[in-house]
């Protein structure tokens, strides 16, 4: 049976890299250039990479020391509490927040992919009015974009239902292709790279109020932009139930991080060495502008193809991840048992259907202002759902170290893991505080988890069993 096949190191690594390296990378060089010098941007990448490495190491050693916890952060949240009732509630809210966030992120990726398709199909931005809904005019472009997004969502659904293992191999191919695409971009950029465009490797930048921002401020501001490039680092851990070896999970998480970090740093420096600073800061499509300097008008076509390839792989990985969360939750008893139903190919069909139906609702945001407003609202709220699991995992790792679980005696590995857990906790707090600096974002995010507590008694199998006991 196909479902007995386990995923090895390279397939898991492809999910980590593919889910991290998405659409954000194409705008990051210009946004970083506006707030940091080359030295400031590089320092921010290294600082963020070091922080995420601590989280990756936490995920890695937990996957080995606690191999029975195969659902990632939701398992760690449950195991964090000695009281089963509290643990079950914590595990459920973690699942709920991450799952709801996946509906939103899936739609964001799909609409971004449709946006890049306009380079080849300009009719997708056609402004001709077709009809009105509730007094709102719907244009031909909006209608076609809705159709394209729907096809992309359910086409990906069909791929995953047909063969979950086949989808993992397809994801590997798309991830390898996107990495090779960035290697091509880097090599091509080196031919027109000019160190003179750097000016000085470090220089103060001007803030919005005209004040001069030094290296500390540059690194802090740039770190806010760079931290989002690493969301997805948890991919291999969430998929660890399908892994051939828990050591592969650890190796894939760390290797995926190092590959993504290398791409981020090098392409950032390449763009800074090809485009003049003023032009880079004002560029909406810095990658296109770099390739235009190398190959002329064909640059925009090449870049659009790379972006589409990037986003297709990211879409495939995140839709799978979004369905894997409720699937693993059902196997653990947190969600109703029907979420764990699989077909002969091992695909979690019910989890996929329900996840994608919820995503479909928000695809209406491209033609409905009401749903668009709700989509924006939930996007803000979902921010915290991707950040909290990092902190919970780090705290649980620290608990394991302090209690000495799986450590026979006080060895160097226990001290090392404890230090890593402390650093991961500190970085996770920084990420949450920085990533939700807007009080509204924080309140909405907490509200999302609060909703999880409200629905917990009605959805959780474990709660029903506790009630009957």
Curated annotation (Swiss-Prot):
Keyword Cell membrane (UniProt): yes
GO annotation (BP), single: amino acid transport
Residues that span the membrane, as ranges: 8-28, 44-64, 90-110, 144-164, 179-199, 213-233, 254-274, 301-321, 347-367, 375-395, 417-437, 439-459
Membrane topology reported for the UniProt record: Multi-pass membrane protein
Reaction it catalyzes: L-ornithine(in) + L-arginine(out) = L-ornithine(out) + L-arginine(in)
One GO cellular component, as annotated: plasma membrane
Entry keywords, A to Z: Amino-acid transport, Antiport, Cell membrane, Membrane, Transmembrane, Transmembrane helix, Transport
Protein purpose: Catalyzes electroneutral exchange between L-arginine and L-ornithine.
Protein family: Belongs to the amino acid-polyamine-organocation (APC) superfamily. Basic amino acid/polyamine antiporter (APA) (TC 2.A.3.2) family.
Protein's name in the database: Putative arginine/ornithine antiporter
Organism: Bacillus subtilis (strain 168)
Gene, per the UniProt record: yvsH
């Amino acid at each position: 049976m196909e479902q007995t096949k386990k995923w090895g190191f390279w397939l898991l690594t492809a999910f980590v890299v593919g889910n991290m390296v998405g659409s954000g990378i194409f705008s990051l060089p210009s946004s970083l250039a506006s707030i940091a010098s080359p030295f400031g941007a590089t320092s921010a990448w290294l600082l963020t990479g070091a922080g995420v490495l601590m989280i990756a190491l936490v995920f890695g050693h937990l996957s080995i020391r606690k191999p029975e916890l195969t659902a990632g952060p939701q398992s760690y949240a449950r195991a964090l509490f000695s009281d089963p009732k509290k643990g079950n509630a914590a595990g459920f809210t973690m699942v709920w927040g991450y799952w709801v966030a996946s509906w939103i992120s899936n739609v964001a990726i799909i609409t971004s992919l449709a946006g890049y398709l306009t380079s080849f199909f300009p009719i997708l931005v056609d402004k001709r009015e077709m009809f009105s809904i509730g007094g709102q005019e719907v244009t031909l472009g909006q209608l076609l974009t809705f159709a394209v997004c729907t096809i992309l969502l359910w086409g990906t659904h069909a791929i995953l239902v047909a063969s979950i293992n086949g989808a993992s191999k397809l994801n590997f191919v798309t991830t390898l292709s996107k990495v090779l695409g960035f290697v091509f971009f880097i090599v091509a950029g080196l031919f027109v790279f000019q160190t003179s465009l750097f000016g000085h490797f470090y220089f103060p930048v001007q803030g919005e109020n005209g004040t001069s921002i030094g290296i500390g401020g540059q690194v802090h501001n740039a770190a806010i932009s760079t931290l989002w490039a690493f969301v997805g680092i948890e991919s291999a851990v969430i998929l660890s139930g399908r892994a051939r070896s828990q050591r592969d999970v650890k190796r894939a998480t760390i290797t995926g991080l190092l590959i993504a970090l290398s791409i981020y740093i090098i392409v950032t420096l390449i763009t800074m060495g090809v485009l003049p600073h003023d032009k880079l800061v004002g560029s909406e499509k810095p990658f296109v502008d770099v390739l235009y300097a190398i190959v002329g008008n064909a640059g925009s076509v090449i870049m659009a193809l790379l972006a589409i390839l990037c986003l297709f792989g990211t879409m495939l990985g995140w839709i799978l991840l979004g369905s894997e969360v409720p699937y693993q939750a059902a196997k653990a008893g947190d969600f109703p048992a029907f979420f764990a139903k699989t077909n002969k190919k091992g695909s979690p069909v019910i989890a996929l259907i329900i996840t994608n139906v919820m995503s479909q609702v928000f695809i209406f945001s491209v033609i409905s202002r009401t749903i668009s407003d709700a989509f924006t609202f939930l996007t803000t709220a979902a921010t915290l759902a991707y950040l909290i699991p990092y902190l919970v995992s780090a705290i649980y790792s620290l608990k394991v170290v302090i209690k000495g679980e799986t450590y026979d005696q006080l060895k160097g590995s226990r001290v090392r893991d404890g230090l890593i857990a402390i650093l991961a906790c500190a970085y996770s707090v920084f990420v949450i505080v920085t990533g939700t600096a807007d009080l509204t974002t924080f309140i909405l995010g907490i509200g999302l988890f609060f909703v999880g507590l409200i629905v917990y008694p009605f959805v959780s199998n474990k709660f029903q069993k506790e009630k009957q006991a």
